[in-house]
Design a protein with these regions (language model features):
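Structured C-terminal cap/extension of enzyme domains
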Residues: 13, 203, 227-337
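Structural motif corresponding to the early beta-alpha repeats
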Residues: 92, 107-128, 149-152
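A general structural detector for well-ordered alpha-helical segments in enzyme core domains, enriched
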Residues: 41, 71-75, 97-104, 130-134, ...
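Active-site mouth loops of central-metabolism enzymes
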Residues: 58-68, 118-125, 158-159, 252
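Glycine/proline-rich, positively charged
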Residues: 122-227, 233-240
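N-terminal binding-site loop/beta-alpha segment at the start of enzyme catalytic domains
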Residues: 1-112, 169, 175
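Short catalytic-loop micro-motif centered on adjacent basic/acidic residues
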Residues: 84-91, 116-118, 180-185, 211-212, ...
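Conserved, mostly hydrophobic/aromatic
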Residues: 45, 57, 86, 101, ...
């Protein structure tokens, strides 16, 4: 997909009052202002009016350090250097990732960030239970963005939008002021993302964000960049890029360097590139990517795609598409409710 100035061209989606089965959405949240750092890139989050860092701190990896103090230091250093977008999930490391981020956001750091987490619950009951746990772990009364996690099965959209589906809990939580924006994530197949957008539209609902794989191999197989991103941009939905390195597997292919992979992601019309950061050196790499970023030319993009095509087609490096390696809810169906 060619790079475009999506801040100017993304059209805000409107919900028609006459849509069959339309869900009565709460008023739009008021954007908040956060400190910015001249060495960081900032972008608009879809059509929300929120301005967030183009580099997002991945939540999974900050729950892996042996010493929780190391996790907190990574988070504080990231924020001090201008990263405002915090990623997390209710199930990451059995809740440890949220707990550590909650401690890190004490003492004024919460006001400096745009906080996102994800919930697995597909029913009202399970969603509400997980939301209350996440609020407690994160030491906050309101989470800026909550996303339906791992929408990876074709039936997931219908479960979420069912009469007892989690969408109703999310909307009630937004109305109550517990969450500000609603999105969804998935990594398996673009067809599932498109189905989610189709079901949402049928119910008169507009997502604020959608999270998807965006990396140097995606273009060659089940491409979210080609199939989903244009639809999201057209609907004014903020695109959150993930799986930039495919965990470590894409880098293991030896076809691309880390900075090159991050610059490729930042060149796409995304609001945020969420990247896993498990140490201060890896954080430094992400900060360097922001400082040195210049949009890749068409020739540079072509060179990257030519280099990665053969490896991508083996299916060995985007394991989140081809194996259950990353499917936490498949291994733990009780999380869905």
């Amino acid at each position: 997909m060619e790079r475009r100035d999506f801040l100017k061209t993304a059209a805000a989606a409107s919900v028609a009052a006459t849509t069959p089965n339309a869900l009565a959405q709460s008023p739009a949240a008021t954007p908040t202002t956060r400190p910015q750092n001249p060495d960081m890139i900032y972008r608009q989050l879809g059509t929300t009016g929120e301005i967030v860092s183009a580099i997002g701190l991945g939540g999974f990896h900050i729950g892996k350090q042996a010493d929780p103090a190391d996790s907190i230091k990574i988070i504080h250093t990231a924020i001090d250097h201008g990263i405002t977008f915090m990623d997390n999930c209710w199930d990451y490391n059995d809740g440890i990732s949220e707990v550590r981020m909650g401690h890190a956001l004490d003492n004024g750091y919460r006001q400096k960030v745009f906080l996102m987490t994800k919930l697995d619950g597909r029913t009202v009951t399970e969603y509400n239970k997980q939301l209350e746990q996440s609020l407690g772990r994160l030491h906050t009364d309101v989470i800026d963005l909550v996303q339906f996690h791992e929408v990876i099965r074709m039936e997931d959209p219908d479960r979420i939008f069912a009469d007892d589906g989690a969408i109703h809990a999310a909307m009630a939580a937004k109305k109550a002021g517990k969450i500000r924006y609603i999105g969804f994530t998935g990594h398996k197949d673009p067809a599932v993302h498109l189905r989610m957008l189709e079901v949402a539209k049928a119910h008169g609902f507009h997502f604020d964000t959608v999270q998807m794989p965006v990396n140097v191999m995606d273009a060659h197989f089940r491409s979210f960049t080609h199939q989903v991103m244009p639809v999201a941009i057209e609907q004014g939905i903020g695109v959150l890029a993930m799986k930039t390195f495919g965990d470590h597997f894409i880098l293991d292919s030896k076809t691309v360097e880390p900075l090159e992979a991050l610059h490729y992601g930042l060149t796409q019309p995304v609001s945020v590139v969420i990247t896993g950061i498990d140490s201060l050196p890896i954080l430094g790499q992400a900060l360097q990517a922001a400082r040195t970023f210049k949009p890749l030319t068409d020739a540079q993009v072509k060179s990257i795609l030519d280099r990665t095509q053969q490896a991508a087609l083996t299916g060995k490096f985007e394991l989140f598409k081809t194996t259950p390696h990353f499917d936490g809810t498949a291994a733990n169906p009780k999380w869905l409710g």
